C-alpha cells in the first residue's frame, strides 16, 4: 500500500519501517494494542500497518471528537505526547471490544506485564517468583548489604503465640549476619592478594562479594527485599489468580495490589482476574488429609541430603530416539525408533549421542529433542541453599 505523507509520519512513530514485509513495533506501541493487532492476523487479510491505520480511521468516523490521521501525524511531528497517549487508549478500548468476540487467551500471550515489587519479605519473593513463564530479577544477597534492612512479619503471626519468639529469632539472625559479614570482609581482604587485581576497587568488590556469599545464609526469610517481574499477560492472569488463593496473607495482599496496578495499564486483557477457586477449594482438604495420615517421620537430617527420587524409564533411549526422529530421515515414529535402539549396542548408542552433542558449545542449550522424561530429587537443605536453587527455576 502506498501511504500518504501523514500516514508515513504516523506509522514510522510506531513501526520500524513502512516499505518492507518485515518490521518491528517501536517502544511507542502500547503493549495491549500490539496484542490486539497481532491477533488480527487470524481474522484479516490486511497488513498490520494497514490495520493499525484502519483502527484510527474507524474511530474518527464514529467519534467526531477523535483526531484524524493527519492530526495524529502532526502530534507526532510536534511531540505532543498527551494527545498521542489519549489516542492510543481509545484505540486499545476500541480493539478490546473486538477481542471479546475473538477470544482473549491467545491475545494475552502477545502482551507483557511488568511489575516492580518492593519491600516484600524474602519468603514472599520466593512465592512471587513461582512462575515458569515469568522473568524475575531480585535484590541480590550476593552483592548487596542487607544489614540495615527491616524485617517483615504477617500481622497474624505477630498476633499469635509465636509472634514475639519469631521476631526475636529473626533479630538474632540479623545480628549474626552483620557480625559474620564484618568478619568475612576482613578475612577475604587478608587472603585475596591485591596484586591479582587491576584496581583497588576490583579487589575490594571481590572480597566483599565473597563475604556476602558466606554471610547471606544467615538471612532470615522475613528480611525485606525487592524484585522486578515480567510475564505474558496470560501468565499474569494465571499467576495472580493463584496468588490470590494463597493461604498466606502477605501473598494475597501483594496479589491484590498486583492485580490493581496491572489493570490500570492493561484493563482490556486483565479485567477478569479473580482468585482461583480450584486452588482455594483444594489446599485445605488436601493438607488435612496429609496431616491425618500420621506416617512416621525419618530422623531429622543433620546435614544437607540429596536423593534421587525417580527417573523416567529408558530416558536415554527416549532422548536418542527423539533426536533421530527429528532428522526426518527414518520415516519411523519415535516408539519404533526406540525399540530398534534397544538392539544396536552401547557403542552405537554412544555414536548417536556424540553426533547429537559433540558440536555443542559452552553457551548452547541442550538439544530440544532431549527435553523428554523426568528426573526427580528429594532435597533436605536450609533456606539459603533453597533460595539459590529456586532462582534457577526452569
Q: What are the residue ranges of the model-derived segments?
A:
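A conserved ligand/cofactor-binding region detector
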Residues: 1-394
Amino acid at each position: 500500500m502506498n501511504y500518504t505523507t501523514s500516514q508515513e509520519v504516523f506509522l514510522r512513530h510506531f513501526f520500524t519501517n513502512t516499505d518492507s514485509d518485515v518490521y518491528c513495533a517501536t517502544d511507542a506501541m502500547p503493549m495491549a494494542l500490539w496484542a490486539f493487532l497481532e491477533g488480527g492476523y487470524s481474522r484479516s487479510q490486511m497488513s498490520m500497518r494497514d490495520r493499525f491505520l484502519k483502527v484510527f480511521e474507524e474511530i474518527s468516523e464514529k467519534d467526531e471528537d477523535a483526531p484524524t490521521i493527519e492530526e495524529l501525524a502532526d502530534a507526532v511531528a510536534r511531540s505532543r505526547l498527551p494527545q498521542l497517549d489519549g489516542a492510543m487508549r481509545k484505540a486499545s478500548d476500541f480493539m478490546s471490544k473486538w477481542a471479546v468476540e475473538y477470544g482473549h487467551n491467545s491475545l494475552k500471550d502477545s502482551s507483557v506485564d511488568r511489575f516492580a515489587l518492593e519491600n516484600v519479605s524474602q519468603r514472599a519473593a520466593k512465592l512471587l517468583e513461582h512462575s515458569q513463564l515469568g522473568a524475575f530479577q531480585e535484590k541480590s544477597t550476593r552483592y548487596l548489604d542487607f544489614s540495615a534492612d527491616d524485617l517483615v512479619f504477617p500481622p497474624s503471626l505477630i498476633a499469635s503465640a509465636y509472634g514475639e519468639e519469631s521476631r526475636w529469632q529473626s533479630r538474632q539472625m540479623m545480628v549474626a549476619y552483620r557480625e559474620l559479614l564484618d568478619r568475612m570482609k576482613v578475612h577475604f581482604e587478608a587472603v585475596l592478594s591485591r596484586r591479582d587485581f587491576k584496581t583497588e576497587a576490583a579487589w575490594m568488590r571481590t572480597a566483599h562479594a565473597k563475604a556476602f556469599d558466606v554471610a547471606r545464609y544467615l538471612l532470615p526469610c522475613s528480611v525485606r527485599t525487592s524484585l522486578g517481574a515480567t510475564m505474558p499477560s496470560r501468565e499474569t492472569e494465571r499467576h495472580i489468580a493463584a496468588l490470590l488463593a494463597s493461604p498466606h496473607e502477605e501473598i494475597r495482599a501483594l496479589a491484590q495490589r498486583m492485580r490493581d496496578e496491572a489493570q490500570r495499564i492493561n484493563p482490556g486483557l486483565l479485567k477478569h482476574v479473580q482468585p482461583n477457586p480450584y486452588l482455594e477449594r483444594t489446599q485445605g482438604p488436601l493438607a488435612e488429609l496429609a496431616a491425618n495420615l500420621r506416617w512416621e517421620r525419618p530422623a531429622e537430617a543433620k546435614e544437607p541430603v540429596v536423593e534421587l527420587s525417580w527417573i523416567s524409564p529408558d530416558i536415554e533411549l527416549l532422548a536418542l530416539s527423539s533426536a533421530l526422529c527429528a532428522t526426518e530421515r527414518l520415516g519411523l515414529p519415535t516408539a519404533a525408533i526406540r525399540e530398534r535402539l534397544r538392539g544396536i549396542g552401547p557403542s552405537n548408542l554412544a555414536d548417536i549421542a556424540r553426533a547429537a552433542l559433540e558440536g555443542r558449545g559452552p553457551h548452547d542449550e541442550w538439544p530440544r529433542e532431549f527435553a523428554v522424561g523426568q528426573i526427580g530429587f528429594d532435597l533436605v537443605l536450609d533456606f539459603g541453599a533453597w533460595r539459590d536453587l529456586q532462582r534457577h527455576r526452569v
